[in-house]
């Protein structure tokens, strides 16, 4: 289990370095999706399967709006990819910073103890995160609908803002 968590956390670091080091929004969005997947995999490793599914859907909804906005504003015919030298230098700087912080925190890293959600419920039928689902749909159902509506509205607002004087992404039929 510890190897799974280690690999997932290293994947999260690699994905975040891919987001931070790339100037083109197309490849940065791919790194952001990868980071969201491995971050939710980290939550699954600690027993939060439903929570990771909900967060993954929220991440994808928010990233759709951000990607539409950034791709419409920064449309480049030849974007820089992960193979260019400037991106490679940024990755080396971020990797050096990560190793420096890891070396600094190595002495007291194991003073904290992380527990799974299922540690205290050995005889429970439900896992730790699934027991909160009825609260989301009973008292938080209206807020869930409002959140979905706001995400859809934000997508249309971004598409209209980036349209400008040209025809843009939303075309009148």
Curated annotation (Swiss-Prot):
Residue spans crossing the bilayer: 1-21, 27-47, 53-73, 82-102, 106-126, 141-161
Keyword Zinc among UniProt keywords: no
Keyword annotations of the record: Electron transport, Membrane, Mitochondrion, NAD, Respiratory chain, Translocase, Transmembrane, Transmembrane helix, Transport, Ubiquinone
GO cellular component terms given for this protein: mitochondrial membrane
Protein name (database record): NADH-ubiquinone oxidoreductase chain 6
A Pfam family per the record: Oxidored_q3
Function: Core subunit of the mitochondrial membrane respiratory chain NADH dehydrogenase (Complex I) that is believed to belong to the minimal assembly required for catalysis. Complex I functions in the transfer of electrons from NADH to the respiratory chain. The immediate electron acceptor for the enzyme is believed to be ubiquinone.
Cytoplasm is among the record's keywords: no
Reaction it catalyzes: a ubiquinone + NADH + 5 H(+)(in) = a ubiquinol + NAD(+) + 4 H(+)(out)
Enzyme Commission code(s) on record: 7.1.1.2
UniProt subcellular location: Mitochondrion membrane
Entry's family note: Belongs to the complex I subunit 6 family.
Bilayer topology term: Multi-pass membrane protein
Gene Ontology molecular function terms on file: NADH dehydrogenase (ubiquinone) activity
Main location: mitochondrion
